[in-house]
């Protein structure tokens, strides 16, 4: 079995074409806002879940080639999201022993910064300096952040609402299964 990520014009013109060619399950999660790069979660048998990068403008691959990992660590990394300015990427990792939300500069270099010690599905507000994520208790959480030069600083995570989200199916990881999204004005959430 070969797993691929496909790209096609949004208006439906033209054929879909593969931009990856992998023997491992792939789950695309985010486009970079200005570069021609897509972050993809790859479920690799040797390294588990990793965020890898694909370039959709390249020609369709005809051989199975490894995709470059974003971090290349032994920890699981998944469900990446590029910041609206494209200078940061948030993702989930179990580097600290449980699923937490990390942010690092894109394309790097830079040290990953833990912004939430427990959570998943990071999603940037398109209108405010806020990073949303789902807490392990199914509450939508948010951190306010600021960037100073090449430093990313964030406040402590806080609940965005007291309402709880519908739980994900047990074991449902490694796909962009966000149960919420942020309105372009940054004032509303759908979920």
Regions found by a protein language model. Give the residues of each.
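Conserved beta-propeller blade repeats
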Residues: 1, 22-43, 70-92, 113-132, ...
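A flexible loop/linker signature enriched in serine peptidases of the S9 family
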Residues: 1-6, 20-25, 41-53, 72-78, ...
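A structure-centric signal for secondary-structure junctions around beta-strands
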Residues: 2, 35, 48-50, 64-67, ...
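Multi-bladed beta-propeller domains
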Residues: 8-25, 54-78, 103-120, 126, ...
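Hydrophobic alpha-helical membrane-insertion signals
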Residues: 134-137, 142-152, 156-157, 182-191
